[in-house]
Amino acid sequence: MENGCTSHWLLSRIAGSESRLANNRAFRCGSIEKAASYLIGELLIINQAEAKSNKRLPKFVHKADTYHKACARCKARGKTCAYGQGAVEKQTVHKPRGQASSVHMPVPMLVPPISSAPSLETPPESVAASPPTVDSIPVSHHVNEDPEAEPDLEKNRAYYTAHGRFAGQVAAAINERAGLIPATCNQVPLVDAPLFGDLNLPSQSCALSSSTELPPRAYADQLIDIYWQHVDPMEPVLDRQRFLENYEKAYSTPITPLCADYDLWLGILNVVFALAVQRQELNPLHQRNEEANRFFQRAWVLLPAESMLWKPGSLELVQCLMLMNRYLHCTNNQQKTWTTAGLAMRIAQSMCCHLTETPLLKGSSDDKALKQKVWASCVALDRCISWSLGKTSALVLIPSPPPSSPQQLGENAMHDTLGLRLHEIGNQIQLAQIQNRTSLAARFRPPLLSQQDEYHNAALQLDACLQDWENSIPSDWQPRNLRMVTDRSSRAERYLLHLRYLHHRIFLYRPMLARFYAMKPDTQPLHKSPSLSHRLLRESASMCIEAAQQVASLVNETLEPDEPIGLLPWWYRIYYLHIAGANFLAAMFRSELFTDSVSQSWESVMLALRAHEHLSPYVQQCLWTFETLAARITGKPYPSMDGGGCGLMVDGSSGVSFDDIFKDINFDFDNFIFGPEDFGEGLV
């Protein structure tokens, strides 16, 4: 039926209901959705009348009749509703088999846009945000019913987010989880886990009466000493000489402002106090969080939004934002964490901190060195924020370090040079992943080169870059020699540098790990030998697990139970332990990956996390989540929050969904790889 005929047919059928339409308030008020719903109701009434006289209405009326029922079925099966607005539009393009033509109807007039059908690209937030329950998990929520599906769907599946999250069979194994209490801890360290407790930030328009107060000089000296010894070496931001000069003036003349931006400097000082308080691991939990949060709230009030957005930028403003961002990183303020990092990066760029030579700018060599130091910290901060929050980091031009030998560089210059080179490799890794996840890249990809093959080609070159970086490290910087470094600050710097290097390796190999676990175990026929692509995929997954093992080993080396302050900040230790633990959970699905060595590394991660339970309530929740997920895979009794055991879980061979396991720790492998907008990985 043509569009014009359809319109006349509708008018003739509804003409008899003109009086009811005129009296309908929704129709008179111009509500399109309600009016469309009313029209469908009229069509259903006509449908019932026509059925009595054995007359048949056009096919689309029958679809309207079954709209809500079909939506319920599609929702239960986890598929996009075939009767949704977007799906109907697609059906008008593809002709069904066995029909010469299909009826093309004006969809907006027939299907009320009451609710959009679930998108295949992004799962509904309500589903992604809540852990699965026994009754809410379907038996099979990924059944390909499209007879014209792409033949290479399985091949590119792990590299294309449009196909949604990984699907798997849940079958009878889900019924055996009837007594399971779903994990309520979906938070991730340095993402949204409140490691520093609940931080309530006051409105910046409401100044705190104590915002300009300073602690007693003796206690302040103690906190300043802790910061320079145990916080600044990890990520240097401030110039020590300038900071100490202003610090002395603040206590010698506390009433007279030191400079025009006195409030800004007080904000820096209060964040320094807050980080130093959190660094003391032996202090009682509630006392530490309460005191540190009070210092941070003072700094927050002292830095109003107008000073960040509309006033000219300064190095002090960038430094204050970076310090604030470090603290916010360990709270549940994701939006403020992401925003402060972006502001610091943009303001630093506006000041040309990213340029090695700025002949038009006046300033001493010390100012230029400080700008380069701040810019290097900005890049490191942006990388940490973006990879942990699952956002795309800024692909900025990083100045090339001077081509000097290790003997010609000092210790600090060597650390900065290695850091800049590593950040540049990280830029290339992320760029390769972004290029592979865009539709534009797929359009210009050679016909015989799949998304998987293209990323594998890039990964080979990037792996060589990482290997060259590791080979360029002097012998006394190698991991095997780190324990022999006598200077505590230097040893901490080198440990953190190697942890970041291993993080880059995990970030590079994780797409292949995701692809490896998306493949069904029986996809390879028994009578055929594994292909080269399959072997490379398996080897890449093994290298990802090996990097996670090295992360766990390095973190355990830094543990010093007898020291009041650990070698590395305790929030970084929890962060990297969480990364390693998630990869070990993935290894449990494959016997060729979860070897005895990996099992020992898994146990070391659990022991290390138990040693951090006194530092944050989140650690106990993380432990319980890891133990529960491991029990689901291995079939051992899973624990409860009170320490008791629960029923038995089944092993991975019985059809437990891989994504169903990892959604409880907010870990979406598919979104992490190549999401349409963000990476979407909670762990990185």
UniProtKB/Swiss-Prot annotation:
Database matches in SMART domains: Fungal_trans (SM00906)
GO biological process: DNA-templated transcription; positive regulation of transcription from RNA polymerase II promoter by galactose
Compartment annotation: Nucleus
Keyword list, A-Z: DNA-binding, Nucleus, Transcription, Transcription regulation
Keyword DNA-binding: yes
Cited InterPro entries: Fungal_SecMet_Regulators, Transcription_factor_dom_fun
GO cellular component, one term: nucleus
UniProt entry tagged with the keyword DNA-binding: yes
Gene disruption: observed consequences: Has low impact on expression of the sorbicillin biosynthesis gene cluster but, except for very low levels of dihydrosorbicillinol, impairs the production of sorbicillinoids.
Pfam families membership: Fungal_trans (PF04082)
Region (Disordered): 114-151
Main localization of the protein described in the UniProt heading: nucleus
A GO molecular-function annotation: DNA-binding transcription factor activity, RNA polymerase II-specific
Function: Transcription factor that acts in concert with sorR1 which is a transcriptional activator of the gene cluster that mediates the biosynthesis of sorbicillinoids, a diverse group of yellow secondary metabolites that restrict growth of competing pathogenic fungi but not of bacteria.
Official protein name in the record: Sorbicillinoid biosynthetic cluster transcription factor 2
Organism: Penicillium rubens (strain ATCC 28089 / DSM 1075 / NRRL 1951 / Wisconsin 54-1255) (Penicillium chrysogenum)
Lineage: Eukaryota, Fungi, Dikarya, Ascomycota, Pezizomycotina
Encoding gene (name): sorR2
